[in-house]
Amino acid sequence: MSSFLKYVTFDCVNPCHLSEFWSEVTGYEPVTVRDDFVALAAPDKRGVRGILFWQVPEPKTAKSRMHVDLASKDPQDEIERLIGLGAQKVDYREGNGTSWTVMLDPEGNEFCIG
């Protein structure tokens, strides 16, 4: 018996704003929206079921120990789209026969796209 990844959860200052960004990034759709909590659900019910956003009083102050990795058929076009949604490009890295771009979401959470 093993576990499976059910949700990815973000602590954030503004759940509504951050969930709008990640909804545009992933295509996940809002199913619960409150001032202090937003839940997005996967439209196709495969993989991670949803992304949760919980309001916390303090902003992010240090590098995350965990991050989300995204894949795209055309990473460069997707990076430009994500920047248009409010993401920030931080770094480009190569290793182990692959490459990826490190980015920040609107609240400073790290994620990568390759």
Where do the language-model regions lie?
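Mid-chain, well-packed structural core segment of small domains
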Residues: 61-82
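Amphipathic alpha-helical segments
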Residues: 15-29, 78, 82-86
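Residue-level preference for nonpolar/small residues embedded in alpha-helices
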Residues: 14-15, 74, 100
